[in-house]
Structures are given as structure tokens and as C-alpha cells.
Amino acid sequence: MSALIIFGLLIALMLTGMPISISLGLTVLTFLFTMTQVPIDTVALKLFTGIEKFEIMAIPFFILAGNFLTHGGVAKRMINFATAMVGHWHGGLGLAGVIACALFAAVSGSSPATVVAIGSVILPAMVNQGFPKQFGAGVITTSGALGILIPPSIVMVMYAVATSGMVVTGPDGQPVSSASVGELFMAGVVPGLMLAGFLAFTTWNRARKFGYPRLEKASLRQRWTAFREAAWGLMLIVVVIGGIYAGIFTPTEAAAMSAVYAFFISVFVYKDLTLRDVPRVLLSSANMSAMLLYIITNAVLFSFLMAHEGIPQALGEWMVNAGLSWWMFLIIVNILLLAAGNFMEPSSIVLIMAPILFPVAVRLGIDPVHFGIMIVVNMEVGMCHPPVGLNLYVASGITKMGITELTVAVWPWLLTMLAFLVLVTYVPAISLALPNLLGM
């Protein structure tokens, strides 16, 4: 009964057009102060302890790094490098767009930032080359979603924050720890590269089928020049992932390092940003960070309410007693997350749903790391379909296309992503191969 009241109130508030963060906060406070006896000082304490986790500090740093890279000319040089490598294949610039998105995803941690950085440069070039605008928009909208799967990923940090500290037990009754940010980052490498390959194949196949243009093959000298110019940006991938794996720094420290590195190469190496531009980038990053931290704060309260009412535990008991197998549970989770993607953005979905679904998943024997990657892939799909697919709106602003037209344009790649979602869901080895290899 408590669950029905809580979710009914939350949905009712969201249907009024109220921001999700405020809807969460009002739902929690209304329920706590009218239907429970929880002391107000406990609620206040939970607000503060919920956002003092060390991992949360990674979010503003990755946002800052992504903003420096977006405005600092790194994307342009990555596109030139990708074009020099694959521009002569079928769909040349389209393939270069997929690869450039994958490379930029590995330094930004954000899908919208990837779409803006790569799309604003390569989409006009594709139209000038003779590609249909719909083709270019489909490539960049979906490939930009790699920004939250290829590490570093802000959504992975959200999942780790949402599930950290939870006391959950596996099917044998033994306690199971939640996934760390480092484990999730390493787990995202193989799925991220695989999805990039799937999207690249879809792009190549459609370009070959419809006879879209390709560029002349670049010489070795041109490729070397393009690589040398992009090397400073590419080194950030080594700094973040290599530093975490080598144990030089934690994911949060890696985020801070990436922000400093991105500032340095944008201002002093590539010089596409001046010191006068830095306050504007800092303010933009602060605005986005504040918005996410406000959502996190209210989501922490919501998770506290769920735990206080015993909803995740009751859901787990019901599913186990009903004889629900792990693969049936994952079907339900995928449908639930894809449906949630129709009216909520990824950060809110992860912060609300992960604390509820995570204990049930662990109870059914599903690995926390694998479950996290599956949720992230679901969020990728949600960012590319209406009505609130964030990548669609970002791409719409770049291409000046309507959302309906863009929705039709992305379907071939969206179907590829759905097929990949099924693969990731039922082949855990894809997510767990690298963490297991590294002994994590």
C-alpha cells in the first residue's frame, strides 16, 4: 500500500510539469510527515550524509572536463583523426563520426556533450559532402549516446552512488557488496567498443546500400599529422583509464585530474580557449553540477523512504516466492527502464530505480557490475527516442530538424542498440570480461 501511495504521488506531481527533483522531494516530505513517525532531524541528517560520499565529487569534475574539451578544439582534432583513418570507406564521414563520438566519449563522460562537440562540426561537413541530413543526424544522435557507456561515465557514477552502502544478500544468503566506480568504468570498456562497432557497421552498411559518398584515402603522412594533432586529447583516455587501473588515483581523483588536464590543453596547447573564456566554462559547469546534485539530494531522500518502508525487500521476497527467474526479472527491468525513458532523463531514472531494483537483482544472483552496465545501455536507448530523448533535442538544435523527423532518422541505429541491449542483458561475460581479467 505504501508503494502505491508513494509512486502515485510522484507520478501525479510529475504530470503537473513539476521538475523531477522537486517532485521527489515533495513526495518524500509529504509521505514522511503525514504517514510515518520519522523524526525531522533524521531526515535532515540523511540529506547531508547522502551527498557527502567521495564518489559524488567526480560528477562536477567530469562535467568541467567535458565542457573544456567541447569548447577547446579537442573534438575537431578527433574528427580529423577519425576521418583520416576511415574516410575512404563506405560512408566515410559517417564512420568518422561514430569513431570520433567513441573517442570523445572516452574523455567527456556525457552523451549530450558528445553530440554537441562532434555533431556541430561533422554534420555540416556531411551535408556539404552530399549525405542526406537525416543520415548524419541518425549517426550522431545514436553514436553520441556512447558518452555514458564508454568510461568515464557520469551515469555510472550515479549508479555507484545510488547503490553504495546498501546491505544486500545473494541467493545463498551471503552479503554482496555494490559495484564500485572503478569496476563499472572497466566493465564499460568492452560493451562500449562493441556498441561502437555495431553502430559503425550499421552506418557502413546503409552507406554502401544507398551509395553515399566517401573520401579519398589519406596518405600515411596525413594520418600521422592528424594523429599528432589529436594526441593531446587522446592522452586523456590513457590518463583516466590507465591511472585508475594502475592504482595511481581513484576515479574521483581521475576526474579532478581530467579537468585540470582538459583546461591545460584547451588553453595552453590548442589555444582554442583563452583565459577570458574560462569563467564562462566554469559557470556553465557549475550550473549543470548544481542541477545534478539537487537531483541526487532528493533521490537520496527517496531511497531512504523506500528502505524505511521496506519496499525493495518486499519486492525481492515477492519475486523469489513467485518463482521468478533471473532472466524473467531482466526482461521486466528492461521494459520498465525503457518505459521510464519515455518521460524521465537518465540521471533521475538511475537514482530512483537503482536502489529499488538492485537488491532484487542481487537476490536473484545477478552480478552488481553486470546489472549496472545493463542499466546504462537502457539509458543510452532512452536518450535517443521521444518524447524526452535528450540527444534528440540536442541534435534537433544542431540540424534544425523536427523531433518527429529525427525520430524516423534514428530508427536503423536505434534497432541496432536494442539488439545490443538484448545481447548485454543475457551475456554477462561482455560486461564482466575485463573486470575479471584485471582481478577486480
Swiss-Prot record:
It is found in: Cell inner membrane. Keywords: Cell inner membrane, Cell membrane, Membrane, Transmembrane, Transmembrane helix, Transport. Disruption phenotype: Deletion mutant is unable to transport succinate, and does not grow on D-malate, L-malate, succinate or fumarate as the sole carbon source under aerobic conditions in the dark. The chain crosses the membrane at residues 4-24, 54-74, 89-109, 112-132, 148-168, 181-201, 230-250, 255-275, 291-311, 318-338, 349-369, 370-390, 410-430. It is a multi-pass membrane protein. One of its GO terms (cellular component) is membrane. It holds the Pfam family DctM. One of its GO terms (molecular function) is transmembrane transporter activity. Part of the tripartite ATP-independent periplasmic (TRAP) transport system DctPQM involved in C4-dicarboxylates uptake. Belongs to the TRAP transporter large permease family. PANTHER family: C4-DICARBOXYLATE TRAP TRANSPORTER LARGE PERMEASE PROTEIN DCTM (PTHR33362:SF5), SIALIC ACID TRAP TRANSPORTER PERMEASE PROTEIN SIAT-RELATED (PTHR33362). NCBIfam families: dctM. This is C4-dicarboxylate TRAP transporter large permease protein DctM. The gene is dctM.
